[in-house]
Amino acid sequence: VHLSGEEKGAVTALWGKVNQEEVGGEALGRLLVVYPWTQRFFDSFGDLSSASAVMGNAKVKAHGKKVLNSFSDGLKNLDNLKGAFAKLSELHCDKLHVDPENFKLLGNVLVVVLARTFGKEFTPPVQSAFQKVAAGVATALAHKYH
């Protein structure tokens, strides 16, 4: 991902304020509600029958936190996202057979949740930087599919 020094600073500063459990749980929950076909990868999570069931599901929240922990690791390796996400790409491609388009969807949902969480602090330039990072992570996760 090619970010200016200013963009890297904005991403790092805002990310330092992110509650990974809350934001991750909400982002994954919203993904499962807004794009219900993504639920097929989470059969073991129990009740996903309604928006309130999804958003209150402890397994969704826990996995959302795990997703953001990985995203956080990626932020430490912006110059080598493909390397940082190689094992996760392999897992999602070879074992889980996740449609790589879902990574883009999750990245966009994450940006929505960050905007909702941080309000005015999530300025258009900050959003632009996060969109670049989310796209870079999605590309890195899709790498093993090619």
Curated annotation (Swiss-Prot):
| Top-level division of the source organism's lineage | Eukaryota
- Here the disulfide bonds are none
At what positions is N6-acetyllysine found?
A: 59, 82, 144
Globin domain: which residues? 2-146
Describe, from its UniProt entry, the tissues in which this protein is expressed: Red blood cells.
CDD domains the UniProt entry points to: Hb-beta-like
Pfam families in the cross-refs: Globin (PF00042)
Single GO term (MF):
oxygen binding
Q: Which residues bind heme b?
A: 63, 92
Q: Which UniProt keywords apply?
A: Acetylation, Heme, Iron, Metal-binding, Oxygen transport, Phosphoprotein, S-nitrosylation, Transport
Give the matching SUPFAM superfamilies. Globin-like
Q: Which residues are recorded as modified (Phosphoserine)?
A: 44
Residues the record lists as N-acetylvaline modifications: 1
What's an example GO BP annotation here? Answer: hydrogen peroxide catabolic process
Q: How does it assemble?
A: Heterotetramer of two alpha chains and two beta chains.
Indicate the family of this protein: Belongs to the globin family.
Q: What does this protein do?
A: Involved in oxygen transport from the lung to the various peripheral tissues.
The identity of this protein, by name, is: Hemoglobin subunit beta
**What taxonomic classification does the UniProt entry list for its organism?**
Eukaryota, Metazoa, Chordata, Craniata, Vertebrata
The gene coding this protein: HBB
